[in-house]
Design a protein with these regions (language model features):
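C-terminal output helix
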Residues: 31-41, 86, 139-143, 155-168, ...
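Short hydrophobic/Thr-rich beta-strand motif most characteristic of the beta2 strand and flanking loop
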Residues: 75-82, 90, 221-227
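Acidic catalytic/metal-coordinating carboxylates
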Residues: 83, 109-115
Length: 227
């Protein structure tokens, strides 16, 4: 059911929480009949058969190729950008369904890109998955929590997680993926049932790890405490 677009009708303070868990869009309470009609029209337009658009923002050519090969299939069109400025230009030229963003870019930081996306009226709801190996400070961690939908830390199982996170925000149909990608996702989710409603304490002095682990565990149905 992850491919089904969910339209939230909620309070504004719940917006980021819902969007980070894959909600398609939201309408702020109290709403009007016109607001609900616009929301339904957005879902109707989004659900129409078409190839999804994904933008990969990464200055390293080998990393770009690796990400493109990992995520690519006939159901999506993948574009790439090497700089923050190029990424913003591309995003403003065509509507995109999801962005994979590295925080280390040659012309500006990934944080600046995220802030410009947030502040642009037509881009503010584009889901951005940060894919980075950068060690985060506490301040950077707090900024990411308010700007990005998800953070995937480069390392063990990061390809599976990146495929999983982008599939969620692109609303990709599991059965439509090639067998090797289905197997990657199945392996990642096989143990989820045992984790539902369990409480876990995450203790780490690296806020990057805390952010990444908390996001993954909460999405698996766990209650997360951090220290």
């Amino acid at each position: 059911t992850r491919h089904i677009p969910v339209q939230m009708v909620t309070l504004d303070e719940d917006r980021q929480h819902g969007l980070a868990r894959g909600a398609f869009s939201f309408v702020t309470k109290p709403t009007t009949s016109e607001g609900l009609e616009d929301a339904l029209n957005r879902i109707k337009e989004y659900a129409a058969p078409r190839r999804r658009r994904l933008l990969v923002v990464e200055d390293n050519a080998a990393e770009r190729m690796s990400i493109t090969e990992l995520l690519g299939h006939e159901d999506i069109d993948i574009s790439t950008a090497e700089t923050g400025a190029e990424a913003l230009t591309v995003l403003k030229s065509l509507p995109y369904d999801c962005v994979v963003l590295d925080l280390r870019l040659p012309d500006m930081s990934g944080f600046e890109v995220l802030e410009q996306i947030r502040d642009h009226e037509k881009l503010t709801d584009v889901p951005v998955v940060v894919f980075t190996g950068k060690e985060l400070t506490a301040e950077e961690d707090a900024r990411l929590r308010s700007l990005a939908r998800s953070v995937v830390v480069k390392g063990v199982e990061s390809p599976e997680r990146l495929l999983d996170e982008t599939s969620l925000f692109l609303h990709r149909v599991f059965d439509g993926l090639p067998p090797e990608k289905q197997n990657m996702l199945k392996k990642l989710h096989d143990s989820d049932e045992d984790l539902q409603n369990k409480q876990v304490l995450v203790v780490d002095d690296d806020t990057r790890n805390i952010f990444a682990l908390s996001s993954v565990l909460e999405r698996r149905g766990m209650r997360v405490l951090t220290a």
